[in-house]
Amino acid sequence: MKVEVYKGAQGKHNLKDYEETYNTFDWKDVEQAFSWSETGKMNMAYECIDRHVDQGLGDKIALNYKDEYRKESYTYKDMQRLSNKAANVLSEHAEVDKGDRVFIFMSRTPELYFALLGVLKIGAIVGPLFEAFMEKAVADRLENSEAKVLITNKALLPRVPVDKLPNLKKIVVVDEDVEDNYIDFISLMETASDEFDIEWLKSDDGLILHYTSGSTGQPKGVLHVQQAMLVHYISGKYVLDLQEDDVYWCTADPGWVTGTSYGIFAPWLNGATNCIAGGRFSPEQWYSMIEDFKVTIWYTAPTALRMLMSAGDDIVEKYDLSSLRSILSVGEPLNPEVIKWVKKVYGLTVLDTWWMTETGGHMIVNYPTMDVKLGSMGKPLPGIQAAIIDDAGNELPPNRMGNLAIKKGWPSMMYRIWKNPEKYKSYFIGDWYVSGDSAYKDEDGYFWFQGRVDDVIMTAGERVGPFEVESKLVEYEAVAEAGIIGKPDPVRGEIIKAFVALRKGYEPTDELKEEIRLFVKEGLSAHAAPREIEFKDKLPKTRSGKIMRRVLKAWELNLDAGDLSTME
């Protein structure tokens, strides 16, 4: 199959020569960017905010915020002052100490960011929660982490089962007219001191505890530590390409790892102006966000790009998006059709990035200056050794599908699974962290995602990666979304079954099923063509936009779908 290539960009970029940088890279050199390389005193919040104030950038805009009711900007000096106030409120009134788990369960407003930085200045471990979580998802995470303090909004309080959480000592409410049995964050912020003695930490002290769901069992707590900032910083520099005058917008919610690693840490470690949008998605709101703040670098998800794509090309003409110089994507692989649409409408090559909660930061990505092979994951971040291995830990040659693995020891690698050391050990084969994703590496060193290992289909002796088939399905004009699974078959072992959501204007017919099947057969191969197609009004997706194939499989085989707290 012929691969389409978009040429890398020319001009002023932080990463000029990928191969040279990769071959000479040393994490020790990255440490020089931080004050702790000289002082030995480490704290993520200091490096994100106070360091820039101390270096004379206090008047630079750190945060632009906009929702239906508010439009505000805060300088780095403002953020220093307000995060100090938040730290004082939390330490004095909520009795937060170093190492405590403090969870944040609230809507996206500036106060969330003040509070999160305040938690980190105390030396506590922050636990982000997505605001759409319901009671069980909240309870599972607070109970497992033994969270001491929760910061939330009044509207979300009914989802917090306080009587089932004996370790939860204090609840901080960020709202007007707070009841006396809660800590009134906004009122206390007004009178709190704007000076705070930051808790200095070691590289392996706790930073953030993200819970991630699997196909079985309860969500697991993935702990990252202070030294993760090395990966956040250098990926912000080389991948996001953050420079002095950039205005950056990451659309991910801070309840998810992208919303913290790349919605908070990476931009502020690099001294960028960071934009936050409150409220719900709409094409008009998003385009006006870019226009109003003159966003230059935009980090979003394929699902969002597909939603903008379905809104049409005409709406784009109503907004001035000329400030944009880079668009990146995360959360699921980019279908080539989306890449082509972005190129046509915005005139930019959207850059796919691969990583996961457990890795803490970018691992395999596409870079502004490097040629993009449409549909490829790209190449490893400098400092990251990636490979395709078999189940015994042996590296496989080019173009052989296997386990996508990373050589352990990078700074943002998960430090532990909270209270589950056996689960932590299960991620590794020898010195390799095994991602659970299936991929292959081509002869040029580009990696190609094929799906979760559990999702790879063996049909009549052939291995088929679901993503390749799904990408072909959504190229067909009638198909809006597609997910495929392997369905047990007595003759072939498995057959490919596709679940398809149609675009408006198309009716689900047997004739259309056959047209779609032939389209895949002619575009890929006979063994990759679905033998069964089922039409659905919508497909199960995570809130970050990934098709939940395990749910499709559970539907088909009448199985338990596992934890559904992340399903939209």
Region locations from a protein language model:
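Structural core segment of the AMP-binding/adenylate-forming
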Residues: 2-6, 10, 117, 121-187, ...
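Conserved AMP-binding/adenylate-forming core of the ANL superfamily
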Residues: 45, 59-117, 134-139, 184-190, ...
